Amino acid sequence: MASQLTDAFARKFYYLRLSITDVCNFRCTYCLPDGYKPSGVTNKGFLTVDEIRRVTRAFARLGTEKVRLTGGEPSLRRDFTDIIAAVRENDAIRQIAVTTNGYRLERDVASWRDAGLTGINVSVDSLDARQFHAITGQDKFNQVMAGIDAAFEAGFEKVKVNTVLMRDVNHHQLDTFLNWIQHRPIQLRFIELMETGEGSELFRKHHISGQVLRDELLRRGWIHQLRQRSDGPAQVFCHPDYAGEIGLIMPYEKDFCATCNRLRVSSIGKLHLCLFGEGGVNLRDLLEDDTQQQALEARISAALREKKQTHFLHQNNTGITQNLSYIGG
């Protein structure tokens, strides 16, 4: 195995977020309010199963332990189960997760688990069906809820649910969410609304700091848990009276980037060192056959030396991220 991926600030990288499509069938107000519009896809299209196999093998050899498949909506790919199986071939990768809108969860989650999936994140921004419809543009609340139940039935011991925190939309619904997870092993993750190139007006109107919820959770006796090295950026809280947990992802908090442990590869094969970084490093020309493995690993390692210490969201610099479907949020 090659040496562990480490940047100039001594941060070690165990976690790859791999986008496999930027297509999504939902029209979430904070991401794709006008629906999906094709952009950035080369004549080659999205990464193939073989290309995904090669890029994840390279990251595994460089110390990656966790791969999250993202989009867009990853389950819209007809070969999604094959993609899971291809990533699963790497023994060094201990966790394979997906972030999904839940559209196909009820139908397909059992086959995903059989292929090797170990974790699921489902996006649910409201527990009110009408508000869910208003946020996502899809009247699929009951279908998504049935999908979460199906995930438990398929054998997943815990399901993570992502909720984008928005002022005057859902920030005041904490009690409703807490009641939902009291007897369910769900880790409910409130994610601060992040500014993107296309979402500046929405951000100014609806952003609220996750610290408001953190202060309330601590007041109610919730306990902050320690992070594991391959965990994502969430601050996780537990309570003895609840089967579920609460996670808070607060990218505007001081030192948020100090514990960064993840890199991103887009659906067209570009390595992105930060969700809100500039440009990207092309890897696709080194994904054509297995003989390029060593060169691929060398390019990834060399690129990491250019990773910045922090994002520049506080300066209203959102980099190339026009919307969160582009490189998978």
From Swiss-Prot:
Induction: By anaerobiosis, repressed by the molybdenum cofactor. This is GTP 3',8-cyclase. Pathway: Cofactor biosynthesis; molybdopterin biosynthesis. Keywords: 4Fe-4S, GTP-binding, Iron, Iron-sulfur, Lyase, Metal-binding, Molybdenum cofactor biosynthesis, Nucleotide-binding, S-adenosyl-L-methionine. Residues 8-234 form the Radical SAM core domain. SUPFAM superfamilies: Radical SAM enzymes. Monomer and homodimer. Its EC number is 4.1.99.22. It catalyses: GTP + AH2 + S-adenosyl-L-methionine = (8S)-3',8-cyclo-7,8-dihydroguanosine 5'-triphosphate + 5'-deoxyadenosine + L-methionine + A + H(+). [4Fe-4S] cluster 1 binds at C24, C28, C31. Catalyzes, together with MoaC, the conversion of 5'-GTP to cyclic pyranopterin monophosphate (cPMP or molybdopterin precursor Z). Catalyzes the cyclization of GTP to (8S)-3',8-cyclo-7,8-dihydroguanosine 5'-triphosphate. The keyword Chloroplast does not apply. GO terms for biological process: Mo-molybdopterin cofactor biosynthetic process; response to heat. HAMAP family: MoaA_B. GTP binds at R17, R68, T99, K160, R262, L263, R264. One of its GO terms (molecular function) is metal ion binding. The lineage of its organism: Bacteria, Pseudomonadati, Pseudomonadota, Gammaproteobacteria, Enterobacterales. S-adenosyl-L-methionine binds at Y30, G72, S123, M194. [4Fe-4S] cluster 2 binds at C257, C260, C274.
